[in-house]
C-alpha cells in the first residue's frame, strides 16, 4: 500500500464547509485502512473526533446531520476511534436526540424534521451494535449510557414507533437486566399503541408492537408474584414461566370473542364444534394480569360495529404469533394442541353448514356484513396454522390431515348448490387464499404420497386457476351495458357533461388498461401447489388439462413481458412432462419449443435419449450354421485358405470374394449377418470324390449344386454357400429342369450371364 495519503487533519478541516459530493468523498476517504494507525491516534484522529463533536453540538441541523454520518463511518471502519472515542460520540448523539425529543412537535413540523430524527436514531442504534459483544466497551462505555438512552427512546416510541421499536427490541433482548427498571413504562406505551392506534399503524409497525410486548415477558417473575402459598415454593420454576403466562393469557382471550359469534350463528347445530368451544382454555379474570383490552361494543342495529370482532381476533392472533415465533434465550413450552383446537373452532365459524339465527335472517344489510366478516374470522385460524407449521414443522404432523379437512370450510360455496364454488366471493379473498396456498404447500411437503384427501385439492385447483387470471375491473360494466345504454337514451343530452363522456370513452376503448395483474409471488405459490398436486395424485382429466393450458398460456405471456420464462413455470412444465396424467397427454413438443433457449438437460435427454459412452461395446457373437454346424470364434482374426480347382476357377474367385466379405462382417450390423439355416438338409458338408460318385449313381435324378471347400488354420472346415442369383433359372419351365436331370452328371464351370455379371459388379 502506498504511504502517500491525505492527512486526517486536512479532512477534518474540510468537514465544516463540505457539501454534496465533497462530503461524500471525505466519508469514502475515511473508510481507508491507512488511518488505522496508533501513531495517528493522539494527534490526527483526536483532532478529527473534536471536529465531529463540534458538528454534533452545533445548532445547525445540517451540521448535526453531517456529524452523525461522520461519527458512524469513523466508528464502523476505524476500531481505534471506536475503542477510544466511541462512548464520547454516543453520548453526544443521544444528548441531541433527547433535546430534539423534548421539542418533538416543533422539530417534526419542519421539512427535514422526520429525516433528522431518522439519522439520530439510526446513529445511536449503529454505534450500540458496534459496541455490543465487546467486553470492555460494553461494560465501560455502553451499559452506563443505556440507562440514559432507554428512557429517551421509550418516550420517542409514542411518536415514532416504526423508527424506535426495532432499537428497543434489540436492547430488550440483549440487555434484559438493564431494561428491567423501565419495563412498566414501556409496557404502558405499548398498551396505549395497541388500544388506541393499532388499526392506524402499518403492518410492519403492528408486528413490531406485538414483538416488543412479547419480549417484555423475558423478565423473570418474582417468587412472591407466582404464589402466596408457601407449600408451592419447592416446585421448580421454569425459565419460560413468565413467557408461558403471557402466551396462555393471550390464548384465553379468544374464547369470549368466539362465544359472541354464537349470537350470530347457531353453534348448537354442530355438537363437535360446541364441544371444542367449551374445551378452549380460560383464565380467571382475577388472576389474568394481561387482560388490558377493552370490551367490544356491538350493536345489530348498527351492522358495521360487527367489524370489531375480526379486528379484535386479528390483534390477538398477531400477539399470539409473536409469542410462538420469536427466538428466545431459553426453550419455551408451546401448547400446540390448544392452538390447533382454536384454529379448528375459528374455521368452523362459517355459515357454510351453520345457519344464522332466525331473528337475523330478514335484515339484508346485516346479512351482508355477516357474510363479509365470517371469512375474516376464519382467516385468523389459517394465519395461526401457517405460523405453527412453518416454525414447528413435523412437530404438528398429527394435525396436518385435520388442517386440510378444515381448510375446505374456507372455500365459499353458492347457496342451494351442489358443491359449486362461489367465484365472486373467491375473487374478493385473493390475499387470504395466498396464505391458504402457502399453508397447503408446507403441509403437502411433509405428507406427500401418504395423503388420500383429493376433494380439497380439486377445489383448491379450481380456485387457483380462477385467481390466476388477471382481474378485469370493468367486467360487470360490460355485462350491464345494455341496461346502461337504455338509461343513457332516456337522459337528456343537455345534461351530459363532456368530461363524463371522455372518462367513459377510455373505459370502452381501452379496457385493457383497467386490469389488475398478478404478481410473480402469487404465481410462484400457485405453481408450487400445482407441482405438488401433479407429483402426488393422478388428477381427473378436466383439472389436469386446465393446468396444462394455464402453464402454456402464462409462460407465453410472461416470456413476451419479461423476455424469459420464470423458474417456477419451468419447473411446472418439467413436472407436466414427467406426469402426463391418466389421459397420457404429453406437452413435450410444446415445452421444448418454449424452452429451446434454456438448454434444459431433462428435455434434451427426453428428446435424444443416449446410453452412457462407457457402456457401449462391439460384441462378436459366433455364427450359428445349424444343429450340425460348429461355433467358429474370432473369425475376423484368422486367415482363410481356399483350395481352388482348375475346373471351377471362376467359382473359386467368387467364393474368395464371399470369404473376404465374411471376414469384414460386424455382428451389430444386420445387413452383414449370415442368415441362420433352418433346414438341416440345406447344410453342406465336406465329402470326397468317391462319395460324390456313389451319390451320383444312387440319386442321379436329383439336381447337384456346387459347393466350395475351405480350410481354416485350426483344421476345421467352413462351408460357404455360393450366393448365385437363380431367379431366372427358377422361372424356367419344369420340362427343362426334367431334361437337365436326365442328362449325365458332370461338374460344369459356372458361366454367369451378362445380366448377372452386371448385377454382381454393381454390388
Swiss-Prot record:
Broad class of the protein's primary localization: nucleus
Task: Please give the residue ranges the record annotates as the region Disordered.
Answer: 718-763
InterPro entries documented for this protein? RIX1_N
Q: What are the annotated GO cellular component locations?
A: nucleus
Q: Where is the composition biased (Acidic residues)?
A: 736-763
Asked if the keyword Repeat belongs to this entry, the reply reads no
**Pfam families recorded:** RIX1 (PF08167)
Q: Which UniProt keywords apply?
A: Acetylation, Nucleus, Ribosome biogenesis, rRNA processing
Instruction: List where in the cell it is found.
Output: Nucleus
Nucleus listed as a keyword = yes
Which one GO biological process term can you cite for this protein? rRNA processing
Q: Which residues are recorded as modified (N-acetylserine)?
A: 2
Subunit: Component of the RIX1 complex, composed of IPI1, RIX1/IPI2 and IPI3 in a 1:2:2 stoichiometry. The complex interacts (via RIX1) with MDN1 (via its hexameric AAA ATPase ring) and the pre-60S ribosome particles. Interacts with NUG1.
Please give the function described in this protein's UniProt entry. Answer: Component of the RIX1 complex required for processing of ITS2 sequences from 35S pre-rRNA and the nucleoplasmic transit of the pre-60S ribosomal subunits. Regulates pre-60S association of the critical remodeling factor MDN1.
Which family does the entry's similarity section mention?
Answer: Belongs to the RIX1/PELP1 family.
PANTHER family per the record?
Answer: PROLINE-, GLUTAMIC ACID- AND LEUCINE-RICH PROTEIN 1 (PTHR34105:SF1)
Q: What is the name attached to this protein's record?
A: Pre-rRNA-processing protein RIX1
Could you tell me which species this protein originates from? Saccharomyces cerevisiae (strain YJM789) (Baker's yeast)
Amino acid at each position: 500500500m502506498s504511504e502517500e495519503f491525505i492527512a486526517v487533519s486536512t479532512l477534518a478541516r474540510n468537514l465544516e464547509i463540505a457539501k454534496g459530493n465533497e462530503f461524500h468523498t471525505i466519508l469514502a476517504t475515511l473508510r481507508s485502512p491507512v488511518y488505522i494507525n496508533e501513531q495517528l491516534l493522539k494527534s490526527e484522529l483526536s483532532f478529527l473526533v473534536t471536529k465531529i463533536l463540534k458538528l454534533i453540538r452545533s445548532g445547525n441541523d445540517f451540521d448535526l446531520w453531517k456529524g452523525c454520518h461522520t461519527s458512524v463511518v469513523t466508528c464502523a471502519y476505524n476500531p481505534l476511534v471506536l475503542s477510544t472515542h466511541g462512548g464520547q460520540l454516543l453520548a453526544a448523539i443521544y444528548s441531541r436526540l433527547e433535546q430534539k425529543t423534548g421539542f418533538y412537535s416543533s422539530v417534526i413540523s419542519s421539512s427535514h424534521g422526520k429525516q433528522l430524527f431518522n439519522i439520530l436514531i439510526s446513529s445511536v442504534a449503529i454505534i450500540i451494535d458496534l459496541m455490543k459483544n465487546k467486553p470492555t466497551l460494553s461494560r465501560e462505555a455502553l451499559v452506563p449510557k443505556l440507562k440514559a438512552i432507554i428512557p429517551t427512546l421509550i418516550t420517542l416510541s409514542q411518536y415514532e414507533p416504526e423508527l424506535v421499536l426495532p432499537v428497543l427490541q434489540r436492547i430488550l433482548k440483549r440487555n434484559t437486566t438493564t431494561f428491567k427498571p423501565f419495563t412498566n413504562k414501556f409496557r404502558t406505551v405499548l398498551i396505549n399503541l395497541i388500544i388506541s392506534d393499532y388499526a392506524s399503524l402499518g403492518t410492519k409497525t403492528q408486528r413490531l408492537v406485538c414483538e416488543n410486548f412479547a419480549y417484555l415477558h423475558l423478565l423473570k417473575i418474582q417468587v412472591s408474584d407466582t404464589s402466596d402459598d408457601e407449600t408451592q415454593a419447592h416446585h421448580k420454576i421454569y425459565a419460560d414461566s413468565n413467557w408461558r403466562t403471557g402466551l396462555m393469557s393471550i390464548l384465553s382471550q379468544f374464547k369470549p370473542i368466539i362465544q359472541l359469534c354464537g349470537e350470530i350463528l347457531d353453534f348448537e347445530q354442530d355438537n363437535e364444534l360446541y364441544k371444542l368451544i367449551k374445551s378452549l382454555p380460560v383464565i380467571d379474570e382475577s388472576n389474568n394480569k394481561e387482560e388490558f383490552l377493552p370490551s367490544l361494543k356491538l350493536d345489530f342495529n348498527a351492522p358495521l360495529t360487527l367489524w370489531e370482532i375480526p379486528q379484535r381476533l386479528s390483534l390477538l392472533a398477531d400477539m399470539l404469533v409473536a409469542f410462538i415465533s420469536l427466538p428466545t434465550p431459553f426453550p419455551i413450552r408451546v401448547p400446540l394442541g390448544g392452538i390447533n383446537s382454536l384454529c379448528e373452532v375459528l374455521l368452523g365459524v362459517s355459515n357454510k353448514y351453520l345457519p344464522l339465527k332466525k331473528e337475523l335472517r330478514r335484515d339484508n344489510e346485516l346479512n351482508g356484513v355477516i357474510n363479509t366478516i365470517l371469512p375474516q374470522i376464519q382467516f385468523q385460524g389459517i394465519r395461526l396454522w401457517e405460523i405453527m407449521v412453518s416454525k414447528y414443522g413435523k412437530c404438528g404432523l398429527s394435525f396436518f390431515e385435520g388442517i386440510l379437512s378444515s381448510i375446505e370450510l374456507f372455500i365459499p360455496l353458492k347457496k342451494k348448490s351442489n358443491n359449486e364454488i362461489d367465484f365472486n366471493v373467491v375473487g374478493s379473498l385473493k390475499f387470504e387464499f395466498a396464505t391458504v396456498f402457502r399453508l397447503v404447500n408446507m403441509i403437502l411437503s411433509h405428507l406427500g404420497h401418504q395423503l388420500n384427501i383429493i376433494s380439497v385439492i380439486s377445489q383448491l385447483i379450481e380456485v387457483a386457476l380462477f385467481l390466476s387470471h388477471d382481474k378485469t375491473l370493468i367486467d360487470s360494466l360490460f355485462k350491464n351495458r345494455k341496461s346502461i345504454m337504455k338509461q343513457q337514451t332516456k337522459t337528456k343530452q343537455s345534461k351530459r357533461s363532456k368530461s363524463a363522456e371522455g372518462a367513459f370513452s377510455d373505459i370502452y376503448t381501452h379496457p385493457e388498461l383497467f386490469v389488475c395483474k398478478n404478481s410473480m409471488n402469487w404465481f410462484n405459490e400457485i405453481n408450487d401447489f400445482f407441482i405438488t398436486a401433479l407429483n402426488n395424485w393422478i388428477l381427473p382429466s378436466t383439472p389436469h388439462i386446465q393446468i396444462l393450458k394455464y402453464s402454456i398460456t402464462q409462460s407465453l405471456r410472461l416470456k413476451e413481458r419479461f423476455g424469459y420464462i420464470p423458474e417456477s413455470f419451468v419447473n411446472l412444465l418439467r413436472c407436466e412432462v414427467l406426469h402426463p396424467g391418466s389421459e397420457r397427454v404429453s406437452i413435450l413438443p410444446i415445452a421444448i419449443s418454449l424452452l429451446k433457449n434454456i438448454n434444459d438437460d431433462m428435455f434434451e435427454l427426453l428428446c435424444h435419449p443416449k446410453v452412457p459412452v462407457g457402456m457401449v461395446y462391439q460384441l462378436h457373437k459366433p455364427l450359428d450354421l445349424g444343429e450340425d454346424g460348429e461355433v467358429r470364434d474370432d473369425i475376423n482374426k484368422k486367415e482363410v485358405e481356399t483350395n481352388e480347382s482348375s475346373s471351377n476357377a471362376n467359382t473359386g474367385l467368387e467364393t474368395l470374394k464371399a470369404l473376404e466379405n465374411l471376414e469384414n462382417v460386424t455382428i451389430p450390423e444386420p445387413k452383414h449377418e449370415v442368415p441362420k439355416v433352418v433346414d438341416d438338409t440345406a447344410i453342406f458338408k465336406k465329402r470326397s470324390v468317391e462319395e460324390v460318385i456313389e451319390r451320383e449313381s444312387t440319386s442321379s435324378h436329383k439336381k447337384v449344386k456346387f459347393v466350395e471347400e475351405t480350410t481354416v488354420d485350426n483344421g476345421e472346415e467352413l462351408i460357404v454357400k455360393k450366393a448365385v442369383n437363380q431367379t431366372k433359372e427358377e422361372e424356367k419351365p419344369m420340362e427343362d429342369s426334367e431334361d437337365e436331370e436326365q442328362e449325365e452328371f458332370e461338374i460344369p464351370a459356372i458361366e454367369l450371364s451378362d445380366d448377372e455379371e452386371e448385377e454382381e459388379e454393381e454390388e
